[in-house]
Amino acid sequence: MRSILMIIVVLFSSACFAQDSEQQLYYAYLDAEMDIWARHIDSTDWNSLPIAEQTVLLNYEYGYAAHAIGAKLEDAAYRLEQFAKHLEAHRAHLDSGIYYCYKTGVCSFRLSFERRQIAKQIKGIYENIKRAMAISPNDPFVLTMQCNVEFFNPIFGSKQKALMYDQKADSIYNTHADQYNYPRWNIRAMQMPLLQSMGYVRSKEEVLQKCNEILTQEPKFSYITGTFLPAYLKEKEKDKEKEKKK
C-alpha cells in the first residue's frame, strides 16, 4: 500500500512540475527572457522523454531556434540543427500537416546560413507550406506559418493575405483552443505577425484597439509594450510629419 502511495505522489509531483514548468516558460516568453528556455531545453534529455513530451519539447526548440536566429546568437546554427534533427526523429508521431509546417520553418531559418542555397530553401518553404495547408488548413499553427510566409516575402507576399491567415488563426485559438495542445506561447507568437500585418493594412485606431485587446488578456506581453507599440507609434509620427510637409 505504501509503495502505491509513493507512486501516486511521484506521479502527482511530476505532473505539477510539468505544469509549473510550462507556466514558467510561458511567462519567460512574455518577458522576453529566453535564456530560461535555453536552460530548459539543455537540461532536458530528449531520449528519455515520452512521445507526448517530445512533441512539446520540439515546439519549444522551434521557438528557441527562431529566437536564436533573430537575436544572432552564437549557437543559432546549432539550435536550428538540433531542432531539425529532432523533427525528423519525431516525424512519425506528428500530424503530417504539422510536420510540413515545421519543415517550412526549417527552410526559412536556413536562409540565414545557407546563402548559396537560397533558391533551394525558398522552394522548400513554398512546397512545405503548400503541403501543410492542404492537410491542415484550419490548424492555427499552420495558419500562423502561412501568415509569416506571406508577410516576409518582399516580392510575392501579401500583407493583406498575411493578415487574413492570422486573423483566422486568432479566431480559432479564441474559440477552439481546447482542440489544440500547443503550449500557450504559440498564441502570443501568432499575435506578433497579426499586429505587424495590421500595421500595414489597417487604421491606427484598429491597431491600437487590437493591442489593448491583447494586453487586456495578457498585460505582461512585453513585445507589444516594449517593441511593437513604440516602433509603430514612431512610424506613425513620421508619416504625420511627411503629410504636413506636402
Per-region residue spans from a language model:
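Short coil/turn connectors between adjacent alpha-helices in alpha-solenoid helical repeat scaffolds
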Residues: Y27-D35, A65-Y78, S108-I122, N153-L163, ...
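Boundary at the C-terminal end of the N-terminal hydrophobic targeting segment
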Residues: C16-A18
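Short coil turns that delineate tetratricopeptide repeat
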Residues: L94, P137, N174, T216-P219
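Alpha-helical repeat scaffolds
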Residues: W37-N47, D75-H90, A119-R131, K159-Y173, ...
